[in-house]
Amino acid sequence: MSSIYGLLNFMSATELLLAITVFCLGFWVVRALRTQVPKGLKTPPGPWGLPILGHVLTLGKNPHLSLTKLSKQYGDVLQIRIGSTPVVVLSGLDTIRQALVRQGDDFKGRPDFYSFTLITNGKSMTFNPDCGPVWAARRRLAQDALKSFSIALDPASASSCYLEEYVIKEADYLISKFQKLMAEVGHFDPDRYLVVSVTNVICAMCFGQRYDHDDQELLSIVNLSNEFGKVTGSGYPPDFIPILRYLPNSSLDAFKDLNKKFYSFMQKSVKEHYRTFEKGHIRDITDSLIEHCQDKSLDENANVQLSDDRVINIIVDLFGAGFDTVTTAISWSLMYLVTNPGVQRKIQEELDTVIGRSRRPRLCDRSQLPYLEAFILETFRHSSFLPFTIPHSTTRDTSLCGFYIPKGHCVFVNQWQINHNQELWGDPNKFRPERFLTSSGTLDKVLSGKVTLFGLGKRKCIGETIGRLEVFLFLAILLQQIEFTVSPGEKVDMTPIYGLTLKHARCEYFQAQTRSSGPQHPQA
């Protein structure tokens, strides 16, 4: 019996020694592999995570809310792990401006995510990790082409620019469609029609073409945009835990399907443009890019050429950014209008006073409609429908606010936290457009500049300016003619659904009443 106890004691001692040895070895390996923090700097703080999973469960279904809560505890620069991947999370307007603007070259990278490789075969200008001179030159080219066929003067039109012409046409269609639906059904889901009209605006700029609202090929693409947002939103687990890519995943399957359909749709349109291209007769953005491609020149400082594939990739980026963001902005705007009827009345009173009913609103009216602008800003701020920027990564070893961040580190930028910071806004949960107006009724430009939605710095949204103009003009034209409500007894659900863009539940009980006769001319 004593020999048995002795054996047990021996085994226990052996196991204990083995455990100590393994622990010490593991500790040594971790210390050896861990990036050495330069003297005077610190590693960003953060909570302890679970083995293998890291902080996946902490993020939950609403990562923007979870990380905002953590920022209150750990500060504007904190670190989490998703799987085994460390992620630095930035909050606070000053901190984010420091990173993306003042230290923009340090933070302009993109992480090499699996989901990003599925977008335009991994060659997307927006999602690709590349951020060198070739990328910068292509981005400038895309910006110039977008500007040329949006806010540049259209000599063949009475409108001030191409964008104004296209939006007026689509807004007029929506008004007549809503009126018809009211006469036939008595209520409708505005998103069903908004998404196609907004898509038609970017189609006109890219391809010089307008699609029917019942075009099945177009509908199959735009109706899958929610799946795109689910996968590309910050914190998508399969990007950080590779084994999850091989498990059944309906969102990932839909994402792959969407990208194939989207690329095929763009490829067909671009090929048709190549077939009908005439040098000197540039019809749209695609023609403009083809011309650059055939000239074999991109930028005098970048020794690269624009291949045929790159033309498609740039168009995919412009097209993708051009319909989802604007559609989401207008959709949220309508939700706020029906839940804040007093705000809607004030906007319409301003439109009647400044413009009247004898003509449509135009882009040149924007500076004279401060309350409408304040409403749009408050919609951007309160909804924060782009809660994070597309994830960034560091391009070199750097420091921020005294914290060391090594090269290649994934960085989340929490825009939602800025827009709901109580110190900045006082009552961030209240929807109050008046906060953006001065005592004299003009737009408060300083406060307006603190609303953060489209990113900052070298990776900011390429279509921000055009998107803002488009949202303004759509809303101005619609609200001049129509009053939006919901069917009596029905309520709208404004609970955000997380993704790259925050969505709300669809509402099929919208109503649109043609406004009673008002002043035909601006009031004195």
UniProtKB/Swiss-Prot annotation:
Residue numbers spanned by region Mitochondrial targeting signal: 33-44
Gene3D superfamilies registered for this protein in UniProt: Cytochrome P450 (1.10.630.10)
Record: glycosylation sites: 71
Origin superkingdom: Eukaryota
EC number: 1.14.14.1, 4.2.1.152
Function in brief: A cytochrome P450 monooxygenase involved in the metabolism of various endogenous substrates, including fatty acids, steroid hormones and vitamins. Mechanistically, uses molecular oxygen inserting one oxygen atom into a substrate, and reducing the second into a water molecule, with two electrons provided by NADPH via cytochrome P450 reductase (CPR; NADPH-ferrihemoprotein reductase). Catalyzes the hydroxylation of carbon-hydrogen bonds.
Pathway: Steroid hormone biosynthesis; Lipid metabolism; fatty acid metabolism; Cofactor metabolism; retinol metabolism
GO MF entries: estrogen 16-alpha-hydroxylase activity; estrogen 2-hydroxylase activity; heme binding; Hsp70 protein binding; Hsp90 protein binding; hydroperoxy icosatetraenoate dehydratase activity; iron ion binding; steroid 17-alpha-monooxygenase activity
Catalytic activity: an organic molecule + reduced [NADPH--hemoprotein reductase] + O2 = an alcohol + oxidized [NADPH--hemoprotein reductase] + H2O + H(+); estrone + reduced [NADPH--hemoprotein reductase] + O2 = 2-hydroxyestrone + oxidized [NADPH--hemoprotein reductase] + H2O + H(+); estrone + reduced [NADPH--hemoprotein reductase] + O2 = 4-hydroxyestrone + oxidized [NADPH--hemoprotein reductase] + H2O + H(+); estrone + reduced [NADPH--hemoprotein reductase] + O2 = 6alpha-hydroxyestrone + oxidized [NADPH--hemoprotein reductase] + H2O + H(+)
Membrane topology: Peripheral membrane protein
GO biological process, one term: fatty acid metabolic process
Keywords in alphabetical order: Cytoplasm, Endoplasmic reticulum, Glycoprotein, Heme, Iron, Lipid biosynthesis, Lipid metabolism, Lyase, Membrane, Metal-binding, Microsome, Mitochondrion, Mitochondrion inner membrane, Monooxygenase, Oxidoreductase, Steroid biosynthesis
Protein name, entry field: Cytochrome P450 1A1
